[in-house]
Amino acid sequence: AKDDLKLNDKTLKSLYSIGFTAAHVMPEKGIFKGKSDLVVLNDEMISVAKDVTELIEFKTTGWSDGGYPNSLLGVIAVIRQTLLDADWYQRSSDIFNKYPEDNEPIALNHSLAELARFKSQRLPFLFMTKEEHAALRALKISEEFSLNPWLLSSGYEYRRLDQIKKQ
């Protein structure tokens, strides 16, 4: 994620002048955006912590983009299927490692392996939620897949605070 951050000197000095010395940097594209880093805001952009969170956003591509998915239902399906695939990948890898002579090796998939690692080590999954209903969706998915959820919220979650507390 650090490599995606492009700040000019003026922006860097402006941030530093108002007290910002570090930033939680995140990739911008996709539903499963990737891993975030904590970086020092200076010329070198040194990573203080790598792979802080795995970032997920309920992001549709829209009809004009020609991409998939272009509906919220499709996004939720992609998130659930990807997490199911990561579970399958972890179980299959464990079985192969335990009984290599009885099984064919599975194809290496770094993305699924990283999702499985984050899940098994209870590392945080940061959900970008643009409204309170997305926060509830994120918590429901987190409960279903035993994730450690963090919410980057919209500020309107107080409208559903009782429901959020229950989850």
Residue ranges of model-derived segments:
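Aromatic/His-enriched, Gly/Pro-containing loop or helix-boundary segments
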Residues: 1-13
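Acidic (Asp/Glu)-rich catalytic clusters
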Residues: 142, 162-167
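Short acidic loop-to-helix transition motifs that present clustered carboxylates
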Residues: 132-134, 155-159
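Alpha-helix initiation/capping motif
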Residues: 6, 71, 109, 160-161
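Acidic, glycine-rich catalytic loops of TOPRIM or P-loop NTPase phosphate-binding modules used
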Residues: 150-154
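Polyanionic/metal-chelating signatures
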Residues: 16-149
